[in-house]
Design a protein with these regions (language model features):
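Active-site nucleophile elbow and catalytic-triad environment of alpha/beta-hydrolase enzymes
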Residues: 115-142
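Soluble non-cytosolic domains of exported or imported proteins
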Residues: 7-10, 120
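Glycine-rich "HGGG/HGxG" loop immediately N-terminal to the catalytic nucleophile
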Residues: 1-7, 72
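Eukaryotic basic, amphipathic alpha-helical target segments in cytosolic regions
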Residues: 24, 49-50, 133, 137, ...
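Serine-dependent carboxylesterase/thioesterase catalytic core
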Residues: 10-116
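C-terminal catalytic-base region of ester-bond hydrolases, centering on the histidine
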Residues: 140-167
Length: 167
């Protein structure tokens, strides 16, 4: 991936998939381990790309601390840290803007249940990956996901991601 903070996640996953397709040692597939948002991106690759040439198949995915159902809040600030609190308020207000959804990686998996209709309408990554919109019926994603031999999620004792139950 070219950026963990900035960029359009869908382009980054496409870029990574093309790199994987060019690694001949992976022709028989591979197992993958993802940490934090990297786990979501591995799942996106496994769901979106066919398990046929030129794309190598993912056999097993293990993710640690990955926000597969998104995050619904930003990390908190100390009560006395007014700059942090102002930045947090501004970020939360703009997370569903077109610019944020196309340029800020974390905004692309922000899933606020209090603004769920807005999330479904503007999400450029997570709502698609999770097949959440009412008219989403992407059989390819489902079939590719079912083709995994194993999908293991590990997530506990997290103090940054809200909610920590974001499996």
């Amino acid at each position: 991936m070219t950026g963990s903070e900035f960029g359009y996640v869908n382009d980054q996953i496409e870029f990574a998939s093309n790199q994987l397709a060019n690694i001949t040692e992976l022709k028989d597939g591979f197992d993958a381990i993802g940490f934090s948002q990297g786990g979501q991106f591995l799942r996106a690759y496994a769901q979106r790309y066919p398990h046929a040439s030129p794309y190598p198949r993912v056999h097993n995915i293990i993710t640690f601390g990955s926000q597969h159902m998104g995050v619904s809040d930003l990390p908190g600030c100390k009560l006395t840290d007014f700059l942090c609190r102002a930045a947090r308020t501004a970020a939360r207000a703009g997370v569903y803007s077109v610019w944020a959804q196309n340029n800020l990686v974390q905004a692309q998996y922000f899933r606020d249940h209090m603004r769920y209709p807005t999330y479904l309408e503007v999400s450029t990554f997570l709502a698609d990956l999770n097949i959440e919109s009412p008219d989403a019926k992407n059989r390819t994603y489902v079939d590719n996901f079912k083709a995994l031999d194993a999908f293991v999620l590990v997530f506990e004792k997290d103090k940054t991601v809200v909610p920590k139950e974001s499996l």
